[in-house]
Design a protein with these regions (language model features):
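Alpha-helical segments in transporter systems
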Residues: 20, 31-56, 81, 85, ...
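ABC-type nucleotide-binding domain
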Residues: 352-614
Length: 614
C-alpha cells in the first residue's frame, strides 16, 4: 500500500532564493516592470525633493523674523517655492497611483503563470507523490499559497522597493544636511534593525507552521465531507469533530503566534524611532541655538529624520504578508521541483484505420510490430516503500485475448499488479513485457493508451454525460459514445436523465447512483476500445441484476482483448481463462475455475463459503 502521508513541514531553505525565483516569473512582464521602476524612482525623487525644498522657505521666513520686517520675504519667491513643493507632492502621488495599477496587472499575470506551471507539472508527477500528500495540502498550494504570493507582489514588493529608494534618498539628504545628526539616526536605526530581525525570525517560523497546519486542516475537512456518509453510518460525528478540533487548534495556535510577532514589529520599531527622533531634536536644537545650524536645515533634517524610519517601518508592517508569501512560495516551488515521472521509453504506439479496420502497432525504430496484447510478468518483486515488499516473485502470462482474473483478500496485491501493468510504479526486480517488449522501453503515454481501466473508485468529471464517456477517447464521435454506452448497458438509464446525454453531472457524478457511475466508467473504457482491458473490481458496486444485465455486453467488449479482472464476486471470474489466487503478495494457486475447484485449495474454500475474501 502507499507510504504514509506527510504531516510535517519544512522551513524555507533560502528565503532570498525563493524571493528571487518569484521575481523571475514577474520578470516576464519586463516592460511593465520597467514602467513600475521608473514610476518608483520618480515618486521617490518627488517626495524626497519636496521635503528638501522646505529649507529655503524656512530660512527666508527666519531671516524676516530676525529682521523684524516680513516684507523682506519676497511674495513671488514664497509662492513659487510653495508651488514647487505642492507640484512635487502631487507628482509623487500620481506616480504612486500609476505604479500601483501596473503592479496589480503584473501580480495577477505572475500568479497566473505560477498556477499554470504548477498544474502542468502536477500532470507529470508520479503516483507516489499523491500517495504522500493529502488533497487538502495540494489544494492549499493552488489557493492560499499562490494567493499570498499575489498579495506580496501587489502590495509588499512595491512597498519594499519604494521604501528602499526612499531610504537611499533620505540618507543622501541627511548626510548632506548634517553628518553629526545623521550618525545619531544611524545608531537608532541599527538598534531597530537588530530588534526587528530577531522578532522577524520568530514570526517567520510561525507563519511556516500556519501554512502547513492550514493545508492539513483543509485535508481533514475535505476528507470529512467526502466521507460524511461513512461518518454518519458509524455514528462517528464526535470523533470527526474531535479530529477537526485538533487541526483547528494547531492552526489557531500557529496563526496567533505568527500574527502576534508580526504585529509586535510596528510598535517596537516605532518606540525606538521616537526615542531617536527626540534625541535628534534635542541635539539639533542645541546646534541651532548656538548658531552652528540654520533653522531651515534643522527643521528640514527633522522632517527627514521622521521619514528616515518610515521605510523601515513600512517594511516591518509588511513582514506578515512577506513571510506568509515566502512560506507559501516555498511549498509551491517544492511541488514544482518534485521530479517528474521518468520515461525513457522509445517504443511508440501507432493506430491506423477506424472501427473494424482499426489496427494497433508498436513502432520500435524502423520495425513495426502488431499489438496483440500478450502480457507477461517474469519474477516480479515490488514494494511501494523499500522496507515493505507487497509482491513477491510474481510470474504470469496472459496470451492475446485471454481473460485473467485475480482473486484474494484485501491487501493481497491484486490492484498493485494492475498498477504495474500501467507502469504507475516501477518494479524493483524482474521484468514485465507487452508483446515481448519490456514495458520500460515503451513510452508511458503510448503504453497507457493501449490500455483501458475501470477503476475501483469511479471518478466522473463535472461535465455532461457525453463528455464523461468521451474522456476515454477525446476524438470519439457522439455516435461512438452512444454505441459504447449501449455496449455497457448504460444507454437506457442515460435516456431517462433530464437532458439525456447532455445532462450535466455534479461533482464526481453525485447526482447518479453508484451503479450508474460504474456503468459510465465501463462505457468510457468501451469507447477507448484498446487491446488490453483492466477491470479493477468493476462490478463490485453494481447490484446483481445490473451485473447480469451487463455481462453479455462486457463479454462482447472483451472479445479479442486481453483482460485482467479483479472482482469481489467470484461469479464474475468463473469464465476466465486463468485465475490467480493471491495471498500476502504471492500467487498461491493458478488455473481455470474447474482446475482450481478440483484442487480443493484456497479458491475452493472461497467458492464454497468455507473462507471469505475479507
Amino acid at each position: 500500500m502507499p507510504g504514509p502521508r506527510r504531516t510535517d513541514f519544512k522551513k524555507p531553505k533560502n528565503a532570498t532564493k525563493t524571493f528571487g525565483r518569484i521575481l523571475q516569473y514577474a520578470g516576464k512582464s519586463k516592460f511593465m516592470l520597467l514602467a513600475v521602476f521608473v514610476m518608483l524612482i520618480a515618486s521617490t525623487v518627488c517626495s524626497v525633493g519636496a521635503s528638501y525644498w522646505l529649507k529655503p522657505i524656512l530660512n527666508d521666513i527666519d531671516a524676516s523674523i530676525r529682521a523684524g520686517n516680513f516684507a523682506t520675504v519676497g511674495v513671488q519667491s514664497l509662492m513659487r517655492n510653495l508651488a514647487i513643493v505642492s507640484a512635487l507632492y502631487i507628482g509623487a502621488s500620481l506616480c504612486m497611483y500609476i505604479q500601483s495599477k501596473v503592479m496589480v496587472k503584473i501580480a495577477y499575470k505572475t500568479t497566473n503563470l505560477i498556477r499554470k506551471e504548477l498544474f502542468d507539472h502536477m500532470q507529470t508527477l508520479p503516483l507516489r507523490f499523491f500517495d504522500t500528500q493529502t488533497h487538502g495540502e495540494i489544494m492549499s498550494r493552488y489557493t492560499n499559497d499562490v494567493d499570498n504570493i499575489q498579495m506580496m507582489l501587489e502590495q509588499s514588493m512595491v512597498q519594499l522597493v519604494s521604501s528602499a529608494f526612499t531610504f537611499v534618498g533620505i540618507v543622501v539628504m541627511m548626510i548632506a544636511l548634517s553628518p553629526p545628526l545623521f550618525c545619531i539616526s544611524l545608531v537608532f536605526m541599527i538598534i531597530m534593525l537588530v530588534t526587528v530581525s530577531k522578532i522577524g525570525k520568530k514570526s517567520k517560523h510561525y507563519f511556516q507552521a500556519q501554512q502547513a497546519n492550514l493545508g492539513q486542516m483543509n485535508g481533514n475537512i475535505e476528507e470529512s465531507v467526502e466521507g460524511m456518509r461513512v461518518i454518519k453510518v458509524f455514528n462517528h460525528e464526535d470523533q470527526a469533530i474531535a479530529g477537526f478540533e485538533q487541526y483547528n487548534e494547531a492552526f489557531r495556535s500557529a496563526a496567533t503566534n505568527a500574527n502576534f510577532y508580526a504585529g509586535l514589529m510596528g510598535p517596537v520599531s516605532n518606540g525606538i524611532n521616537n526615542a531617536g527622533y527626540a534625541l535628534i531634536a534635542l541635539f539639533g536644537g542645541l546646534l541651532a541655538l548656538t548658531g552652528r545650524l540654520d533653522i531651515g536645515t534643522f527643521f528640514t533634517f527633522l522632517s527627514y529624520a521622521k521619514q528616515f524610519t518610515q521605510p523601515i517601518n513600512q517594511i516591518a508592517n509588511q513582514m506578515n504578508t512577506i513571510f506568509s508569501a515566502l512560506a507559501g512560495a516555498e511549498r509551491v516551488f517544492e511541488m514544482m521541483d518534485t521530479a517528474s515521472e521518468e520515461d525513457q521509453g522509445t517504443v511508440t504506439l501507432t493506430v491506423t484505420g477506424a472501427g473494424e479496420e482499426k489496427r494497433w502497432y508498436w513502432q520500435d525504430g524502423d520495425r513495426r510490430v502488431p499489438v496483440h496484447g500478450a502480457v507477461e510478468f517474469h519474477h516480479v518483486t515490488f514494494a511501494y516503500v523499500p522496507e515493505k515488499v507487497v509482491l513477491h516473485d510474481i510470474s504470469l502470462y496472459a496470451k492475446e485475448g485471454q481473460k485473467i482474473a485475480f482473486v484474494g483478500s484485501t491487501g493481497a496485491g491484486k490492484t498493485t499488479i494492475t498498477n504495474l501493468i500501467n507502469r504507475f510504479y516501477d518494479i524493483q526486480e524482474g521484468t514485465i513485457t507487452y508483446d515481448g517488449i519490456d514495458i520500460c522501453r515503451i513510452k508511458k503515454d503510448d503504453l497507457r493508451r493501449s490500455l483501458a481501466m475501470v477503476l475501483q473508485d469511479t471518478h466522473l468529471f463535472t461535465d455532461t454525460v457525453m463528455e464523461n464517456i468521451r474522456y476515454g477517447r477525446l476524438d470519439a464521435t457522439d455516435e461512438e459514445c452512444i454505441a459504447a454506452a449501449k455496449l455497457a448497458s448504460a444507454h437506457s438509464f442515460i435516456r431517462r436523465l433530464p437532458e439525456g446525454y447532455q445532462t450535466m453531472l455534479t461533482g464526481d457524478g453525485g447526482n447518479l447512483s453508484q451503479g450508474q457511475r460504474q456503468l459510465l466508467a465501463i462505457a468510457r473504457a468501451a469507447v477507448a476500445d484498446p487491446p488490453v482491458m483492466v477491470l479493477d473490481e468493476a462490478t463490485s458496486s453494481i447490484d446483481t441484476r445490473t451485473e447480469k444485465h451487463i455481462e453479455h455486453g462486457m463479454d462482447r467488449l472483451m472479445a479479442g482483448k486481453t483482460t485482467f479482472v479483479i472482482a469481489h464476486r467470484l461469479s464474475t471470474v468463473r469464465e476466465s481463462n486463468a485465475i490467480m489466487v493471491l495471498e500476502d503478495g504471492r500467487i498461491i494457486e493458478r488455473g481455470d475455475h474447474n482446475a482450481l475447484m478440483a484442487q480443493q485449495g484456497r479458491y475452493y474454500q472461497l467458492c464454497t463459503g468455507k473462507a471469505k475474501l475479507s
